Amino acid sequence: MNYYDYLSPIKQKKRVFISFHMDDLHAKTLLIEQAKSDKFDLEFINYALNEPFETKWKTQCEGRINQASVTICLIGRQTYSREAVIWELNKSYELGKKVFGIVIYRKEQNYWPQPLITYKSPVYYWDIPTIVNALNSP
């Protein structure tokens, strides 16, 4: 065994921007709590904003999306129709961020926000190992 075998790789926190409809705040909270589990190699630095959708919000939001490496869109019943979610996703693509969706309600009809379709982003069912793999893939 050489010197380098003793060095463990330095893990960086994943800076994740979570785009969601406020009706699905419970899902955002659950995702962040599940990410804290020692069972999974997953950490979030939460950059989501919960303020009115206006110019000031957009400026702050763009800064936070820019600081993140990934945008996750939590797809609930009405996510597809939310102006702020669509703006966040389009801004994420514009800034060159990795973007993917997570379906919150597996047994219900879920419509995806148009940017996820337009940019052919992957969408997964809620499953932490799958989310971890998606975050760690190139």
Role assignments for model-derived ranges:
Residues 1-67:
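Conserved N-terminal substructure of TIR/SEFIR domains
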Residues 36-40, 91-101:
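Arginine/glycine-rich "motif VI" loop of SF2 helicases in the C-terminal RecA-like domain
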Residues 78, 99-109:
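Short beta-alpha junction loops
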Residues 25-28, 81, 107-112:
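Short catalytic/ligand-binding loop motif for oxyanion handling, primarily in non-cytosolic enzymes
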Residues 31-34, 86-89, 114-117:
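Short, glycine/charged-enriched secondary-structure capping and boundary segments
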